[in-house]
């Protein structure tokens, strides 16, 4: 409502009526105790995306992907692809009660898992950094509870919520970056938040816009049906995406690969 209308109300009806219209105290809030927004884009300097099927891209398609129309990541994910060996999820959580609410647990609940994807691999290598990770989830564990980030072995990490909790007042926001990893298989999962709301404990579920999140472990190069390189690995070739024979790279691990791709 404009300032002119507010001034007119004040002049015509007095301070009490003005306050009742413009200075109403916030009413009780219904719905879930925490608003969870998954619309924020993660910064991906580099990534690996595997497809369940073998993709035979033509040069014209590679040229389109190289110019970012569409982005190769989006193209592959729209065709059933999964990041590997980890996927990053950015969430913004916001308190939605008059009193403070507290997040006391987050779990990645697996819906199904099977052999890692082997159709095609898109490998975009990066020389840059990554966003700071808030929590880590090991999908190879029997239960994938939130862990403190850091270290090479997820099984040795401390449970995040044994030492932390996340308290949110009304409208207070916090950004979380979650990493889910697998070194053994492909998994689909959803996130379960456990929230204390006054005297009640509530479970809130988060998925990827109506679908489960996905992650796959990486196979050796020669186990993929087709292979595409991008990122800094192709700068010597003029940049963009290039197709290579997976057998030419043998049994090397894509995640630790540091060689050239040839031009």
Name the predicted role of every residue range:
Residues 155-187:
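Low-complexity, intrinsically disordered segments enriched in Ser/Thr together with acidic residues
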Residues 112-154:
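Long, charge-dense
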Residues 140-153, 196-263:
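Acidic, serine/threonine- and proline-rich intrinsically disordered appendage/tail regions
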């Amino acid at each position: 409502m404009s300032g002119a209308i507010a001034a007119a109300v004040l002049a015509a009806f007095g301070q009490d009526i003005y306050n009742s219209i413009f200075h109403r105290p916030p009413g009780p809030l219904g719905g879930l105790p925490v608003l969870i927004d998954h619309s924020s884009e993660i910064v991906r300097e580099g990534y690996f995306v595997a497809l369940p099927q073998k993709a035979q891209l033509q040069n014209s398609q590679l040229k389109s992907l190289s110019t970012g129309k569409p982005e190769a990541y989006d193209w592959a994910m729209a065709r059933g692809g999964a990041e590997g060996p980890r996927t990053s999820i950015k969430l913004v959580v916001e308190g939605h009660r008059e009193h403070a609410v507290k997040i006391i647990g987050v779990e990645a609940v697996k819906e199904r898992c099977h052999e890692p994807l082997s159709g095609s691999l898109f490998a975009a290598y990066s020389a840059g950094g990554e966003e700071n990770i808030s929590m880590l989830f090991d999908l190879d564990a029997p239960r994938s509870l939130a862990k403190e980030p850091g270290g090479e072995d997820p099984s040795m990490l401390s449970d995040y919520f044994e030492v932390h909790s996340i308290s949110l007042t009304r409208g207070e926001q916090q950004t979380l970056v979650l990493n889910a990893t697998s070194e053994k298989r492909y998994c689909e999962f959803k996130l379960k938040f456990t929230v204390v709301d006054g005297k009640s404990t509530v479970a809130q579920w988060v998925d990827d816009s109506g679908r489960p999140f996905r992650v796959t472990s990486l196979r050796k190069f020669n186990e993929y049906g087709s292979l595409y390189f991008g990122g800094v690995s192709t700068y010597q070739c003029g940049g963009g995406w290039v197709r290579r024979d997976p057998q030419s790279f043998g049994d090397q691990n894509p995640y630790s690969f540091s060689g050239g791709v040839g031009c």
